[in-house]
């Protein structure tokens, strides 16, 4: 049985308080922000479009806190709802520390730090790719998700500049995963649930570059 943390996490989500005040209180805790886990309603609500609610200075501090939290977790992406803030803001960064064979099969290449404000994506073409993925809000588990192999992402950056880019391979998976968070979706909503595996099982059995062996053993289909 897991013991409850004795760290007090401030309630930053009271609807009666201005968002800026709630974020200020959250940032006052210092260090990496607490990551909320599946079962928290904030992860199931569509996030509010960002329209200057935090102001430039507070936005910059919040973005830096997201970056710090993502690195500490560690992860390759983090959406604002995952720290209890229902705004359409996410950060991504992937140094791609994987063997060359794995990187080639999964299309995993290094991605610089990026801030995505009000992002949305659409599939480009019909190709789909299926790989195991995990989530900082669902710790300890991974599952296979089939996603569009190429997507067009539109968003703003932290300075309000337009972003309109196509992503392929693992970067496409990251931007889809984080944008889904902003729409109240978890990766498990799109996953092949027969593939659900603990991190221990992943390390022991399913560390291959593709999930083909897992599909055969666990009884689930992969896209053609």
Curated annotation (Swiss-Prot):
Keyword Hydrolase: yes
One Pfam assignment: Pep_deformylase
Co-factor requirement: Fe(2+)
Family annotation (InterPro entries): Peptide_deformylase, Peptide_deformylase_sf
Cysteines paired by S-S bonds: none
Record: residues binding Fe cation: 135, 177, 181
Molecular function, one GO term: peptide deformylase activity
Known EC number: 3.5.1.88
Record key words, sorted: Hydrolase, Iron, Metal-binding, Protein biosynthesis
Co-factor note (free text): Binds 1 Fe(2+) ion.
Protein name: Peptide deformylase 3
Name of the gene: def3
């Amino acid at each position: 049985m897991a013991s409850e943390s004795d760290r007090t996490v401030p309630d930053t989500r009271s609807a009666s308080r201005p968002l800026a005040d709630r974020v200020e209180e959250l940032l006052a805790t210092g260090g990496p922000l607490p990551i909320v886990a599946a079962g928290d309603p904030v992860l199931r609500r569509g996030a509010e479009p960002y329209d200057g609610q935090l102001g430039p200075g507070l936005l910059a501090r919040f973005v830096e806190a997201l970056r710090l939290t993502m690195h500490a977790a560690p992860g390759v992406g983090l959406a604002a709802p995952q720290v209890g803030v229902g705004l359409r803001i996410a950060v991504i960064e992937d140094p791609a520390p994987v063997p060359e064979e794995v990187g080639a099969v999964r299309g995993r290449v290094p991605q610089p730090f990026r801030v995505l404000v009000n992002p949305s994506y659409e599939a480009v073409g019909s190709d789909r790719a299926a790989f195991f993925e995990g989530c900082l809000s669902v710790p300890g588990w991974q599952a296979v998700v089939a996603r569009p192999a190429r997507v067009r992402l539109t968003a703003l950056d932290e300075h309000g500049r337009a972003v309109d880019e196509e992503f392929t391979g693992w970067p496409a998976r990251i931007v889809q995963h984080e944008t889904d968070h902003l729409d109240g979706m978890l990766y498990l909503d799109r996953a092949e649930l027969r593939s659900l595996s603990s991190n221990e099982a992943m390390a022991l059995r399913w560390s291959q570059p593709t999930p083909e062996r897992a599909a055969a053993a666990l009884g689930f289909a992969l896209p053609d």
